[in-house]
């Protein structure tokens, strides 16, 4: 294999929406950094049966709805 082709993996902390912290190996950030998730499998409608609503933290959902409001979505 070629040297210095792939980034180095290190352990980071991933903070779930319920406050739980999970250690994972990743190329994101630096060793020991914490990645806080806005949405994870415990609250995502795809894994919870669709009953939960997504939080519109970045305004993307409302922007999409406004753009396509005449199509009846």
Curated annotation (Swiss-Prot):
Keywords: Ribonucleoprotein, Ribosomal protein, RNA-binding, rRNA-binding. The keyword RNA-binding applies. Coiled coil: none annotated. It comes from the Bacteria. GO terms for molecular function: rRNA binding; structural constituent of ribosome. PANTHER family: 50S RIBOSOMAL PROTEIN L31, CHLOROPLASTIC, LARGE RIBOSOMAL SUBUNIT PROTEIN BL31A. Binds the 23S rRNA. Belongs to the bacterial ribosomal protein bL31 family. Type A subfamily. This is Large ribosomal subunit protein bL31. It comes from Jannaschia sp. (strain CCS1).
